[in-house]
Amino acid sequence: MSLLIEQARYHLSAHNARQLPDDGGYEVAFAGRSNAGKSSALNALTRQNSLARVSKTPGRTQQLVFFQIQPERYLVDLPGYGYAKVPQDLQAHWQAFIDRYFRTREALRGLVVVMDIRHPLKDYDLQMLGYAAERGLPAHGLLTKADKLGRGQQMQTLQKVKKEVSSRFGDSVTVQTYSGESRQGVDELRGIVGGWLGLDVEPPADA
């Protein structure tokens, strides 16, 4: 399964609904606030150093970026939340686009919300988890940069976040700690994402 995920390649970028791929198959979306480590997590997941561009400019991702693993198997990089330098009309466009994507996209099978373990469950994170809950989709909270905290602090934050998401969203959200520096949690993330994409079993020959 991990070898399949490593086959991910850039497919297309969508600025509006007309540019999205056909709505079939399996997609897993990744969302995260600026500098939460979303691009780095995608690169670690696929064992590629530059699949998702890592930018020092907050909110640089201004489109839905699709990475194809196999036909009808995609990882989707959602726009980073960092719109301070973006005009209000463009902010409104992205809000409407993402809202429509979550409400109508049949191929969407799960959502990974990437959060800095030192600053979890901000308003944007809860909004994204809420989108998944409204659709009845599973979500996974990825607490990144775990190496910045001691083991005890990691576990304390993990339990606190688990308790909070459980009270808000029930058992539809799972949570883990993760570090790109030490590769802590990469295999766990692969298992979650691979399961949602149907990569834990052989896909149909005509997929």
Swiss-Prot record:
Q: Where does this protein hold Mg(2+)?
A: 39, 61
Could you tell me which residue ranges the EngB-type G domain spans?
24-199
Q: Which residues bind GTP?
A: 32-39, 59-63, 77-80, 144-147, 178-180
Q: What is this protein called?
A: Probable GTP-binding protein EngB
Q: Which keywords appear in this protein's UniProt record, sorted alphabetically?
A: Cell cycle, Cell division, GTP-binding, Magnesium, Metal-binding, Nucleotide-binding, Septation
Question: What is the native source organism of this protein?
Answer: Xanthomonas campestris pv. campestris (strain ATCC 33913 / DSM 3586 / NCPPB 528 / LMG 568 / P 25)
Molecular function GO terms recorded: GTP binding; metal ion binding
The cofactors named for this UniProt entry are: Mg(2+)
Which PROSITE patterns does the UniProt record give?
G_ENGB (PS51706)
